[in-house]
UniProtKB/Swiss-Prot annotation:
GO terms for biological process: tricarboxylic acid cycle. Belongs to the MQO family. This is Probable malate:quinone oxidoreductase. The keyword Signal does not apply. Its EC number is 1.1.5.4.
Length: 497
């Protein structure tokens, strides 16, 4: 059996692993890095263009990031944090573009206004107050608000055409929002990594087992599903960035920090339109409010998508119930993840979230006509024949123990790392890929503390991410500086012709 030594083993060929590998190779090109992917291509699960919405999540249009509190206030803390995190991604991508590590920005990111759209007096009041609170902060100072139908006709013509003129509507807009093809971004970063002789990519190599040895390193067994046989990687550090597949791998590792975690898988579907005469009439990501009782991941939105240079429209998502952790996974994934240490939390979440489960099952059983009826709220003239149904990627929400030992369901991402810093796993979903760079900086800070204490690594991180070590939420001058640069380098300051 072949045994290969590696300083770093990246499990999963998606945006998370690729971002970490790219950052580490910039910090120390002599590192021996191996990436393993169970499929025969990188970026084919959640990172693949049509498996996600491609929204550069910045909190501009996503109303679920600014929830109303019990006393009628609006909490904006999460929106500020997500916006600042996305600015970190933009800085790193700009750095790579400037140094040839990424191609022309329009191959992976395009300007696409981010807009929120609501109707009815109560939701309009909410949106107006949200705008007042957010636009008072430097991160959101360019956000516009309007309840004038003529202005909205200019912002989102497809949404406003043939709408009831008596219906009260309102919207906000940030002109320099973005549509990101995370598949293209990831493939290009992998191609650049492959130019370094110290990087190796192993496709069609799923992980069968991983075990820590007495010297603190990791013995990782791989199977070669293309040619047969197996390989062993002897790794100093392992990152589990396998999307929904990260939880089962974390469980295989046996680290104590992974005890109690479970996964709640949610499937997704989109309505897609590629008819040029319709696509050309909409150029924005228009987000609404989730229906009462709907989970946060089901916020409806009508989006411009540009994947492999081809424009299209997307509407959804339509969530559904599933037991798979990956789109290409097994229906037994959920059941296979149940352990003695997470059985209680999983059962607790199941019992306490029966309404959510019923909602997901109901969503999955909708007809095409039912789905198009939802679309009519955002495109009054939509015709069934113009739209087709597409399967999105899987999202595995986090189940974890609360302070009372019961289970709670979390809609976010979380980094789980071993005490000795030799293994880390990223669990969860939204906002996901948009904050990949910030998430991988967290991995470096937790698992490469000794190296990060050196002046060389700190200086290099500062070069890659000029805001590193400082708060974009608190520092308006710094935000203005980095945003001006990234909008220019990535071409996000250009108005659409």
């Amino acid at each position: 059996m072949t045994v290969k030594k590696a300083d770093v083993l990246l499990v999963g060929g998606g945006v998370m692993s690729t971002t970490l590998g790219t950052m580490l190779m910039q910090l120390d090109p002599s590192l021996n890095i191996v990436m393993v992917e169970r499929l025969d291509h990188v970026a084919h699960e959640s990172t693949y263009g049509w498996n996600n919405a491609g929204t550069g999540h910045a909190g501009y249009c996503e109303l679920n990031y600014t929830p109303e509190t019990g006393d009628g206030d609006i909490e904006i803390t999460r929106a500020l944090a997500i916006n600042a995190s996305f600015e970190v991604s933009l800085q790193f991508w700009s750095y790579l573009v400037e140094r040839g590590g990424l191609p022309s920005p329009d191959e992976f990111i395009n300007t696409c206004p981010h807009e929120s759209f609501v109707w009815g007096e109560s939701d309009i009041a909410f949106l107006r107050k949200r705008h007042q609170l957010l636009s008072a902060h430097h991160l959101f100072k360019d956000m516009e608000f309007s309840d004038d139908p003529r202005t909205l006709q200019d912002w989102m013509p497809l949404v406003m055409e043939h709408r009831d003129p008596m219906q009260k509507v309102a919207a906000t807009r940030v002109r320099y929002g973005s549509d990101v093809d995370f598949g293209s971004l990831t493939r290009n970063m992998v191609e650049h990594l492959q130019k370094n002789a110290n990087f190796e990519l192993l496709l069609s190599h799923p992980v069968k087992s991983l075990k820590q040895t007495s010297d603190g390193r990791w013995n990782v067994q791989l199977s070669d599903s293309r040619n047969g046989g197996s390989k062993t990687i002897d790794a100093g550090f392992v990152f589990l960035g396998a999307g929904g597949g990260a939880l089962p791998l974390l469980q295989k590792s046996g680290i104590a920090e992974g005890d109690g975690y479970g996964g709640f898988p949610v499937s997704g579907q989109w309505l897609v339109c590629k008819k040029p005469d319709i696509v050309k009439r909409h150029y924005a990501k228009v987000y609404g409010k989730a229906a009462i009782g709907a989970p946060p991941m089901s916020v409806p939105h009508l989006d411009t998508r540009i994947i492999n240079g081809e424009p299209a429209l997307l509407f959804g998502p339509y969530a559904g119930f599933t037991t798979k952790f990956l789109k290409t996974g097994s229906s037994f994934d959920l059941f296979g993840s149940i352990r003695a240490n997470n059985f209680g939390p999983i059962m607790s979440v199941g019992i306490n979230n029966m309404d959510l489960t019923r909602y997901l099952i109901k969503e999955a059983m909708q007809s095409h006509s039912d789905r198009v009826k939802s679309l009519l709220n955002y495109f009054p003239e939509a015709k069934e024949d113009d739209w087709t149904l597409a399967e999105a990627g899987q999202r595995v929400q986090i189940i974890k123990r609360d302070a009372q030992g019961r289970g709670k369901l979390e809609f976010g991402t979380e980094l789980v790392a071993s005490k000795d810093g030799t293994l880390a796993a990223l669990l969860g979903a939204s906002p996901g890929a948009s904050v990949a760079v910030k998430a991988m900086v967290d991995v470096i800070e937790r698992c490469f503390k000794d190296r990060l204490s050196s002046a060389d690594w700190t200086a290099k991180l500062k070069e890659m991410i000029p805001s590193y070590g400082e708060s974009l939420v608190d520092n308006a001058e710094l935000l203005h500086s980095v945003r001006s640069r990234t909008l220019s380098v990535l071409g996000l300051d250009k108005k659409r012709l």
